[in-house]
Amino acid sequence: STNTALHLPAIANEAGIRLPITLFDELSARTPHISYMNPSGPYTMSDLDAAGGIPAIIKRARMLFSNEMTCSGMTIHEIADSAFIYRDDVIRPLDDPVHTTGGITVLYGNIAPDGAIVKSAGVSDDMLSSTGTARVFNSENDAMHAILSGNIKEGHVVVVRYEGPKGGPGMPEMLAPTSALSGMGLKVPLITDGRFSGGTRGAAIGHISPEAAEGGPLGLLLDGDRITIDIPNHQLTAHVTDDELVARKATWKPPEKDLSGYLKRYAASVSSAIEGAILRAP
């Protein structure tokens, strides 16, 4: 799940450790993808269990694990030694993986100067690189209404903004619009400063930073802008000149939200998604 790139930096921050988003990109580039699980692939957790389960995964990737004692009374290496792999198609050998790289890719560009995240393992080959026309929405609900009303077509790029840590506030998961697009058979990318569930499939790009509510370029996009998504080359680009973005920024105002209490305090204190959406000390 792309939430890994949100929660691990936040946990590390509590220990005084900085875990940069670039590290996820570096590790993914050299980590083979060995189990093609639903919703990205054809296999379910029942298939994985029948193929040997987590002990079989540990056996495949034994070199990653130290020999610590577990609550089972066996060490990790003892679990690996006692495991069986019953289906090589479900738990692939390291030298014959589903993909040679891992499931997460970090994108950059004039829409996401600080970065954005996509679960690249869940993107079909024909959607890894595309250019489309922006359909811009200032909330998940507005995007859902447009999708369910039949106003989104292939060739569009759905832009959902003001759903980030500050803008939501709280960075909700955009599972509903991506599920609707998939269920309607639409191969349409969705980009957002919100986040996604592990159940998301397709070209769903989230965690765009800086988010729209902080004045990020995502908030400057207009209907009709052309957007290029190039996952293999880590690019997310709007075909809008720098001068035009500066001109738009001069008249930009975030939508007002009637916040009070904890949500207002949270929105004022939370960092960007790329930093783990952590609460800054006052």
Can you say where each PLM-predicted feature lies in the sequence?
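Catalytic or ion-coupling anion/metal-binding cores of large enzyme and transporter domains
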Residues: S1-E211, G216-P282
